[in-house]
A protein has these predicted regions:
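Residue-level recognition of short, well-ordered coil/turn positions
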Residues: 14-17, 41, 66-67
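Short, solvent-exposed alpha-helical "recognition" segments
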Residues: 34-51
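Amphipathic alpha-helical repeat elements characteristic of tetratricopeptide repeat
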Residues: 2-3, 48-52, 56
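Amphipathic alpha-helical protein-protein interaction segments
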Residues: 52-96
Length: 96
């Protein structure tokens, strides 16, 4: 795929466009999309870029004291903490 097509796919991912609509916009078939790992990767990068930008905006508002955003930020922290393995010596560390 061309660099222009991959960029458009990434932008569609950032906008959370469905795959079928992404393919229509970029004028490729769904089979072409699913056969190309770089297209799938760029779509996911677009999604993650938007997720990061939204989180950054939430954090900025939480720091400014917006109560609703403080709660959303706390939910983000809880989600992130589920991804972090327990440290050695913590109560949650698996027995060895």
């Amino acid at each position: 795929m061309t660099a222009e097509t991959l960029e458009a796919i990434e932008n569609c991912g950032a906008a959370e466009m469905p795959i079928a609509e992404t393919c229509a916009i970029t004028e490729i078939t769904e089979a072409q999309y699913w056969a190309d790992q770089s297209a799938q990767r760029r779509y996911r990068i677009g999604q993650l870029r938007s997720k990061m930008e939204i989180r950054q905006a939430v954090i900025k508002m939480a720091k400014a004291g917006v109560p609703q955003m403080v709660k959303v930020y706390q939910d983000f922290v809880a989600e992130t903490n589920r991804d972090i393995p327990p440290t050695v010596g913590s109560d949650d560390a698996p027995d060895q």
